[in-house]
Regions:
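N-terminal intrinsically disordered/low-complexity leader segments
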Residues: 1-2
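Hydrophobic alpha-helical connector segments
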Residues: 52, 56, 66-92
Length: 125
């Protein structure tokens, strides 16, 4: 597996469990069994890693929702299933993640909001 992907997947796991602010790049390197220097070869800083995690996470949800849309019986069923999927995502998310994004990672939060707005517009039409 590509190290960039491996790092992003581990970051998402740790961020969802502990919140973004609570997980340092040093913690990340330890969890991955690599040095901080190696970690910084793949991501320039934590902000870049956070943005990548948000991008990957929202892309996974988008693809899942597109699949749900294809399998839904009708438009009402589609909306119900998609909202159920999105709510499941929020239930499984540490509440600190969105707070940390908004307060400490504005670019990541902006990306999340853009996704949310595009997502809603796309699936409501």
């Amino acid at each position: 597996m590509d190290n960039r992907i491996r790092i992003a997947e581990k970051a998402e796991e740790l961020y969802m469990r502990f919140g973004i602010r609570s997980v340092s790049m040093e913690n990340m390197a330890e969890e991955l069994g690599m040095s901080k220097k190696t970690l910084y070869q793949y991501y320039a800083d934590k902000e870049e890693l956070v943005e990548e995690v948000v991008k990957r996470h929202t892309e996974v949800i988008r693809l899942e929702c597109e699949q749900i849309a294809l399998e839904a019986k009708d438009a009402i069923h589609e909306i119900f299933l998609i909202m159920e999927r999105v709510m499941e995502d929020f239930r499984n998310m540490n509440p600190m993640v969105l707070f940390d994004l908004q307060k400490f990672h504005p670019r990541g939060f902006q990306r999340f909001n853009e996704y949310k707005n595009e997502f809603l517009l796309h699936f409501i039409r």
